[in-house]
């Protein structure tokens, strides 16, 4: 009978030990998941701040003067305004995409307070597309060979729309939405 009690006691102790180990492991996994979630949130906030700083830097240093024969009226999801600017056709369509990024700068951020250096280690994702109104054609971001794209813009009368890509974050901080609940696409 004593041996049976010892065996039952040992089995209960083993079950308790297994249960405690499982509880510890579950708590460790929950803690790691919570820490990973907090880190992802911090990283996202940091990326948003860097993007805002880059936009202001781009407005001051990368955006060409509004001159040239191609008049563009660009609408962005953040507002329904037609933002008009003139461009010179060239091999790159990058100025158009930089312009679209700078349209999301809040009016409270004046140009004289724009930074002289871009955020360290930040490369803009350009997670939006620019399309012509009619016929609907996507304007490609090209570093070279963009002359055809500028011709397409000119044929469309310069009426363009910018819209967020499927998994993009473009404009989220400005609109205050971190989910894609309201479809921002036009």
Model features per residue range: what roles?
Residues 1-186:
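Ubiquitin-system adaptor modules
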């Amino acid at each position: 009978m004593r041996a049976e009690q010892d065996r039952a006691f040992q089995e209960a102790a083993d079950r308790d030990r297994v249960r405690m180990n499982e509880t510890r492991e579950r708590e460790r996994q929950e803690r790691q998941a919570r820490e990973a979630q907090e880190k992802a949130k911090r990283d996202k906030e940091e990326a948003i701040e860097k993007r805002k700083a880059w936009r202001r830097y781009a407005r001051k240093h990368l955006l060409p003067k509004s001159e040239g024969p191609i008049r563009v009226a660009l609408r962005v999801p953040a507002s329904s305004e037609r933002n008009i600017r003139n461009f010179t056709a060239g091999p790159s369509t990058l100025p158009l995409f930089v312009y679209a990024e700078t349209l999301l700068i809040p009016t409270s951020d004046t140009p004289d307070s724009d930074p002289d250096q871009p955020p360290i280690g930040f490369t803009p994702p350009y997670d939006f597309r620019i399309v012509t109104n009619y016929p609907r054609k996507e304007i490609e971001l090209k570093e070279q060979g963009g002359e055809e794209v500028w011709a397409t813009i000119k044929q469309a009368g310069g009426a363009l729309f910018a819209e967020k890509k499927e998994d993009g974050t473009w404009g989220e901080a400005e609109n205050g939405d971190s989910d894609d609940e309201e479809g921002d696409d036009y």
